Amino acid sequence: LQIAIARDPAFCLLSQENIDSLAQYGQISYFSPLYGSDLPSADLVYLPGGYPELFARQLYRRKRLFNQLRDYIEEGGKLLAECGGMVLLSHSLTVRQGGTAYEMANIFPFDFTMTTRTNAGYRQAEYHGLALRGYESHYTETANPDGNLFTATPVYTMRGNSTSVPLFRYKNVFAGLVRWYWGEMDMLDLWKKVPTETNSPAFPSFWQKNI
């Protein structure tokens, strides 16, 4: 497998154990959304967490990469986006209340706004029998009017309380605000569990290519 991982100051929350887990299955290459890299040819793309809010203006300008991500997704490419990686796939990111809403890749219709309130804690989920464990930590509020169209499975605290943001799926894309731990698991199992009769919606009307 050819595995492409985003890595730069905006997407830097990478677990070495997760990288080692992926390295068992193929060759890893890195690219930088922040510095204008093209999307490498890949069988799997991993967008980890980080601090996109610190570089929102620069990321907003990466229209070429956004279009490459859309083409990759429409062609059935596998992609996992965690926390900051999910923000990159959202409709927009507002760094402060009342500030500029910077358009992101516009894969999902969610609008993120940075706040002073943290959401943090260990999380768990189950996707078609696959048990997931990870950690969530962010300062964002999410407006997702069409979010239910994309829900793959709910996410819970370790005490069993539901969280506000589930794990989302569109085609072969999984996205959420949790940074999952793959050290003792096979990340590729996510796609093995995708039902044959997929109920992923067509790209909704909000989706438009950036010119």
Which residues make up each language-model segment?
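Hydrophobic anchor at the start of a short beta-strand
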Residues: I28, L79, V173
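N-terminal beta1-alpha1 cap of cysteine-dependent amidohydrolase-like domains
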Residues: L1-R64, R70-Y72, F112-T115, N144-D146, ...
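Cysteine-nucleophile active-site neighborhood
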Residues: P52-H128
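Amide-donor transfer/coupling interface in amidating biosynthetic enzymes
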Residues: F112-I211
